[in-house]
Swiss-Prot record:
Record-stated family: Belongs to the metallo-beta-lactamase superfamily.
Cofactor detail note: Binds 2 metal ions per subunit. The endogenous metal is unknown.
The keyword Ubl conjugation belongs to this UniProt entry's keyword annotation: no
Sites where the protein binds a divalent metal cation 2: D62, H63, D145
Name this polypeptide is given: Exodeoxyribonuclease YycJ
Annotated function: 5'->3' double-stranded DNA exonuclease. May play a role in mutation mismatch repair (MMR). Required for accurate coordination of cell division with DNA replication. May play a role in cell wall metabolism.
Effect of substituting H218A: Moderately increases mutation frequency
Cofactors demanded by this protein: Fe(2+); Zn(2+); Mn(2+)
Gene Ontology MF annotations: exonuclease activity; metal ion binding
Length: 264
């Protein structure tokens, strides 16, 4: 079994990604309660006791809600950059010092046979960052919670065999929706979230012949729909000359249901 993953949950109510190999299993974020997380692991037919560490992207509650509980219950080391630690420590409760580790932006760390590269994104958090996972010339890239995708970010994630990529909102749905203008402005800003079309334009710059799977992630429950996101992204990519459904597959994610285990 090579590098594989499951998007356990994705959306504004909670985010978690499982990444593993035969040798090592990791969790990125813990945005649901401990009980909900355990239920998702069972649903995905994964064993939470196999997880050997949690990587944190940033301190927003939909990414750390269950972090303290899981770290304490399963004696898991937690990795985050210094600014994120400072921002979230009062939110997650006490975690023993020997379980707290610094993973700085731009660093590369090795966990068993998985090499993990972190990179900064543009979001209204202390120092948000996401990850690219490498194993035996296979690569998985995770990028959500960013207002735009810069050339620097693209440089890290380009050529991944699989992407978990933010496709947060449809701009028209957001503009016409019930959110107050202050929240709309925040989502549309450079430190907010990427819309369907902008996500697709960024994808067009990082997809290569090696890319086989794209998972559309962090969809807004109020300002997007799975079918709309998939259609919008597919349309832009097809206009750019990509063979959606032939060269690679586009997949949905869900806030309450894990995706099937996908090998990279």
């Amino acid at each position: 079994m090579g590098l594989h993953f499951s998007v356990l949950a994705s959306g504004s109510t909670g985010n978690m990604l499982y990444v593993g190999t035969d040798e090592k299993k990791l969790l990125v974020d813990a945005g649901l309660s401990g009980k909900a997380t355990e239920a998702l692991f069972k649903q995905a037919e994964l064993n939470i006791n196999d997880v050997s560490g949690i990587l944190v992207t940033h301190e927003h509650s939909d990414h750390i809600k269950g972090l303290g509980v899981l770290a304490r219950k399963y004696d898991l080391p937690v990795y985050a950059n210094e600014k994120t630690w400072n921002a979230m420590e009062h939110l997650i409760g006490n975690i023993p010092t020997d379980q707290k580790f610094i993973f700085s932006v731009g660093d590369v760390k090795t966990f068993g046979d998985i090499e993990v590269e972190s990179f900064g994104v543009s979001h209204d958090a202390a120092e948000p960052m996401f990850y690219a996972f490498h194993n035996n010339n296979r690569k998985l890239a995770l990028i959500t919670d960013t207002g735009y995708v810069s050339d620097r970010m693209k440089g890290v994630i380009k050529g991944a065999n699989a992407f978990v990529f933010e496709s947060n909102h449809d701009v028209e749905m957001l503009r016409m929706g019930r959110y107050p203008w202050s929240i709309k402005r925040r989502i549309l800003s450079d430190v907010g979230h990427v819309c369907n079309e902008d996500a697709a334009l960024a994808m067009a710059d990082v997809i290569t012949d090696e890319t086989k799977h794209i998972y559309l992630a962090h969809l807004s429950l109020d300002n997007n729909m799975k079918e709309l996101a998939r259609m919008s992204v597919s349309q832009v990519l097809e206009e750019k000359g990509f063979g959606v459904g032939e060269a690679f597959e586009i997949h949905d994610t869900d806030p309450k249901m894990p995706t099937k285990i996908q090998y990279v």
